[in-house]
């Protein structure tokens, strides 16, 4: 079973290797069931998404994304922060796949 959560983009990270010069991951955070979640999500992004989103990275900050994951897990470094196990980008809320930001 999967869980789906809506989280806010607070930062972006450049990719490495074959994704250098493109979006590597979205840094997202928010609350779900009274748990503060902060995680990076890069899985689920196509090469085209990575290029397009990197060019418009300033517009991504503050956007809400829908993320699917296996579970919510406790952050190993801090007790008041949670993360997602195997997070996967689904879409930006309010935008359909392929729609321009």
Please tell me what each predicted stretch does.
Residues 100-101:
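Extended, charge-rich, solvent-exposed interface segments
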Residues 1-95:
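Nucleic-acid 5′ end/cap handling module spanning
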């Amino acid at each position: 079973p999967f869980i789906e959560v809506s989280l806010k983009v607070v930062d972006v990270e450049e990719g490495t290797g074959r994704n250098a010069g493109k979006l590597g991951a979205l840094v997202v955070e928010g609350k779900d069931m009274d748990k503060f979640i902060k995680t990076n999500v890069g899985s689920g992004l196509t090469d085209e998404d990575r290029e397009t989103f990197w060019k418009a990275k300033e517009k991504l900050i503050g956007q809400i994304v829908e993320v699917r994951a296996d579970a919510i897990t406790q952050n190993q470094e801090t007790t008041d922060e949670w993360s997602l196990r195997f997070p996967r980008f689904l879409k930006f809320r309010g935008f359909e796949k392929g729609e321009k930001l």
